[in-house]
């Protein structure tokens, strides 16, 4: 089977590549990858090349396919797997394999990654339960289950303690104060959505950022009135220019501090602020992955000793987290489409990956069977004045107030003749 992929060839070197895949073995799957949402972790891998923990050597001869937030359709089933999978079945990939090597889809494999028209899912990923049946029909939601899975996993990884009781209570503190720092970006939107609609029921959620435009957008998507209707106080704060942001934020809790803090940017000042905002037994989750292996910040160990403050770091999520993300999206409790601001085809991947931090907006969603430059949804109407494809896409997203939706996805895929398979039974 001939495939077209976006692959890492070295540091800051991402290219389109077209080649014949080998025949699958009896314990592998050949799949068509319909959609992949671009992760900042992919940019980090492309930036570092083989210096990245998960990226192997010899990229020049064996380039690795980018992308891991993906979903698609099974095309061919190895004969030892016919009792579990069938041709035409939709799937979503759980890329967190948990291997000692750190290897996983989108970083480490020549034939296994989300930015591909076709890929081979290897035996090891199948044995680890990474291929989940997808019962829905909206591939964007399936792709976005992976970033939502990471967000959900972070909430589950936080923990709290009782003095002299040597068991951790996992999860955020019920009825507690949550601070989401540097959290008005694409992943932050998902974090706010889950805090309000995921059923964890904090009493207060404070969202902190320094970008008025991003804060205004997320407030439209997730307004304070929605949170209030669920018994949650939601506060949006721009700390840019504040003389004492720590005092201002602590005052929102009556100077008690925050029970659970999630840091969404690997910026020393943000981590230090998080430390100062912790309540007694407060848990700081360092969600943002740094590119610097020597990333260090001061931390108050007086509070560690006397106030039981503590730190966790999370990367990825479990299969159960993925299943929760899919289920909550299917019922409409979570709206992962809120995160999406740009749509593109496979041809857009190299430039998108290499310039991701400089492209404004939220998640960039790629449809591998589509040829289309990366385009902001907000620009569809203007482009539609001269292009009938964008004219219809603009009409379809207007029905959901500018949010990407299943009807727009189906129309786009149909224009390029993409086979979308059938829902898992």
Regions found by a protein language model. Name each.
Residues 186-187, 214:
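Hydrophobic/small residue at the entry helix of a nucleotide-binding pocket
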Residues 1-66, 400-425:
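Short N-terminal strand-loop motif that marks the start
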Residues 162, 220, 243-248, 256, ...:
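C-terminal hydrophobic helical "lid"/dimerization subdomain
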């Amino acid at each position: 089977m001939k495939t077209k992929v976006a692959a890492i060839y070295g540091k800051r070197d991402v290219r389109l590549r077209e080649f014949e895949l080998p025949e699958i073995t009896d314990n592998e799957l050949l799949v068509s990858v319909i959609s992949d949402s671009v992760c900042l972790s992919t940019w980090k891998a492309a930036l570092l090349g083989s210096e990245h923990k998960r990226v192997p050597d010899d990229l020049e001869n064996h380039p690795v396919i980018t992308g891991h937030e993906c979903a698609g359709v099974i095309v061919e089933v190895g004969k030892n797997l016919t009792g579990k999978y069938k041709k035409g079945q939709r799937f979503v990939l759980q890329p967190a394999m948990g291997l000692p090597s750190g290897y996983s889809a989108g970083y480490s494999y020549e034939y296994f990654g989300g930015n591909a028209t076709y890929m081979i899912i290897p035996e090891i990923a199948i044995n680890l339960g990474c291929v989940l049946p997808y019962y829905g029909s909206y591939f964007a939601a399936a792709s976005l289950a992976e970033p939502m899975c990471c967000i959900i996993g972070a909430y589950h990884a936080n923990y709290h303690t009782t003095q002299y009781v040597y068991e951790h209570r996992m999860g955020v503190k019920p009825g507690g104060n949550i601070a989401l720092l540097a959290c008005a970006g694409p992943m932050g939107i998902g974090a706010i959505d889950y805090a309000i609609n995921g059923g964890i029921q904090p009493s207060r959620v404070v969202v902190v950022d320094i970008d008025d435009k991003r804060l205004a957008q997320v407030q439209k998507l997730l307004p304070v009135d929605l949170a209030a209707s669920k018994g949650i106080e939601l506060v949006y704060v721009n700390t840019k220019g504040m003389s004492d942001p720590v005092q201002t934020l602590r005052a929102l809790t009556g100077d008690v501090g925050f029970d659970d803090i999630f840091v969404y940017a690997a910026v020393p000042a943000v981590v230090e602020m998080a430390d100062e905002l912790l309540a007694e037994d407060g848990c700081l989750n360092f969600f943002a992955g740094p590119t610097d292996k020597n990333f260090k910040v001061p931390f108050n160990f007086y509070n560690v000793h006397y106030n039981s403050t503590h730190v966790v770091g999370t990367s990825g999520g479990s299969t159960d987290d993925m299943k929760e993300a899919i289920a909550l999206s299917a019922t409409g409790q979570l709206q992962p489409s809120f995160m999406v601001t740009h749509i593109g085809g496979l041809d857009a991947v190299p430039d998108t990956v290499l310039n991701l931090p400089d492209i404004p907006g939220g998640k960039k969603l790629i449809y591998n069977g589509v040829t289309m430059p990366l385009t902001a949804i907000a620009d569809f109407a203007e482009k539609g004045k001269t292009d009938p494809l964008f004219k219809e896409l603009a009409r379809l997203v207007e029905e959901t107030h500018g949010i990407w939706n299943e009807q727009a996805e189906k129309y786009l895929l149909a224009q390029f003749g993409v086979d979308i398979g059938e829902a898992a039974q």
